[in-house]
């Protein structure tokens, strides 16, 4: 039997994140071969992943990253089973590492095949499922490109938002962050009325009409009043028309124009866990 040193165990632990005893067992089984021990730990991860495939992984960390020139951003969620794991510093660090890699890709499928320290992201997730003992997977994958992109991550990494602005100007970074905070807090259904799907519009009109009938309003007045209520729905639930949370006397669209008269919010992405 090969003699396994503490230094070898520690090296394997740093490389894989596995526990000390698991690393020692893998090195013993691999007769001291470092690469062989890594492979054994990966196989263990695959077995654990297969057993936990049907488990709910609604906890985790939502992370937003923006590239160096603020023209592209990405949000990923690294999902797990428990809040205990989601708050672990190593888990959050891994989520941030994944997000940095994700900036280079436009789809979740491409990202999962990307290299992560010598193995694919997908294989790393399987490995970590074995190491942590919980189902670990990538949930959301969103990208946004615009003349200027900013971000905001809410405390606890449960909500992440990207905001795209129409141009890069002095104050754009703060404006994008403030609008992202707005989206995090108020959860708008769309950027503006054009972005609200027809199903939602039809539902809101029907709810309004049903309420008006219960109030005894004449049938010939329902359409006009319902349209007024729909406009109120747009004002309350679309990002650019919402009252700005830091100054409710102006809308979000009005707020960004205080930064630059021609500045507009052109897109946003929001991911929330739980």
Swiss-Prot record:
Record InterPro entries: EF-Ts_dimer_sf (IPR036402), Transl_elong_EFTs/EF1B (IPR001816), Transl_elong_EFTs/EF1B_dimer (IPR014039), Transl_elong_Ts_CS (IPR018101), UBA-like_sf (IPR009060)
Gene Ontology MF term list: translation elongation factor activity
Keyword tags: Cytoplasm, Elongation factor, Protein biosynthesis
Keyword Protein biosynthesis included in the entry's annotation: yes
PROSITE patterns named in the record: EF_TS_1, EF_TS_2
Chief place where the protein resides: cytoplasm
CDD domains, A to Z: UBA_EF-Ts (cd14275)
SUPFAM superfamilies listed in its UniProt record: Elongation factor Ts (EF-Ts), dimerisation domain, UBA-like
TM region(s), chain numbering: none
Region (Involved in Mg(2+) ion dislocation from EF-Tu), start-end ranges: 82-85
Keyword Cytoplasm: yes
Location(s) in or outside the cell: Cytoplasm
Its biological purpose: Associates with the EF-Tu.GDP complex and induces the exchange of GDP to GTP. It remains bound to the aminoacyl-tRNA.EF-Tu.GTP complex up to the GTP hydrolysis stage on the ribosome.
Family: Belongs to the EF-Ts family.
Protein name, UniProt field: Elongation factor Ts
Organism (species): Christiangramia forsetii (strain DSM 17595 / CGMCC 1.15422 / KT0803) (Gramella forsetii)
């Amino acid at each position: 039997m090969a003699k396994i040193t503490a230094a070898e165990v520690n090296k394997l632990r740093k490389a894989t994140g596995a526990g000390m005893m698991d690393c020692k067992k893998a090195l013993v089984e691999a007769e001291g071969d470092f690469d062989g021990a890594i492979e054994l730990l990966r196989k263990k991860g695959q077995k654990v992943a297969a057993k936990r495939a049907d488990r709910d992984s609604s906890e985790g960390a939502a992370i937003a990253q923006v590239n160096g020139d603020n023209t592209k951003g990405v949000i990923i969620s690294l999902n797990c089973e428990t809040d205990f794991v989601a708050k672990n510093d190593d888990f959050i660090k891994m989520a941030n590492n994944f997000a940095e890699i994700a900036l280079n890709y436009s789809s979740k499928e491409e990202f999962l095949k990307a290299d992560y320290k010598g193995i694919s992201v997908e294989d790393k997730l399987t490995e970590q499922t074995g190491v942590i003992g919980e189902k670990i997977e990538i949930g959301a994958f969103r990208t946004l490109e615009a003349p200027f992109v900013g971000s905001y991550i809410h405390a606890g990494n449960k909500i992440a938002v990207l905001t795209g602005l129409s141009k890069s100007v002095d104050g754009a970074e703060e404006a994008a962050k403030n609008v992202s905070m707005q989206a995090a807090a108020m959860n708008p259904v769309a950027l503006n009325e054009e972005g609200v799907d027809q199903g939602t519009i039809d539902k809101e009109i029907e709810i309004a009409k049903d309420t008006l009938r219960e109030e005894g309003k004449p049938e010939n007045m329902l359409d006009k009043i319902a349209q007024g209520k729909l406009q109120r729905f747009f004002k309350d639930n679309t990002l650019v028309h919402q009252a700005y949370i830091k100054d409710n006397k102006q809308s979000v669209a009005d707020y960004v124009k205080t930064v630059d008269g021609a500045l507009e919010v052109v897109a946003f992405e929001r991911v929330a866990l739980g």
